[in-house]
């Protein structure tokens, strides 16, 4: 999947929300590792936990270029104070994954290649 992505993908700073609590996919998670292999930058790179609970203000300050989230968590994410001012949200640079896609993304195992393709398709849509 990574071989099909444009070089501009490497400049994309991405936030992946795995749960509305909110928990994000850190660099040490299988999701974060997949994102790195695809060439994008994880805004949670410095987080020591695989799936850290995130302070919403951290994401607001980080100003990711792209946000990946499940469709079912999208509404609550968009209602967070200040998030409507984020460029990624104002410019609709969001990938909202259907429940079946989200299920593939958040479960490690034999479908990890499929998860990589789902993420790669999202990245392709927003790389210039």
Residue ranges and their predicted role:
Residues 1-128:
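N-terminal ligand-binding lobe of clamshell/alpha-beta domains
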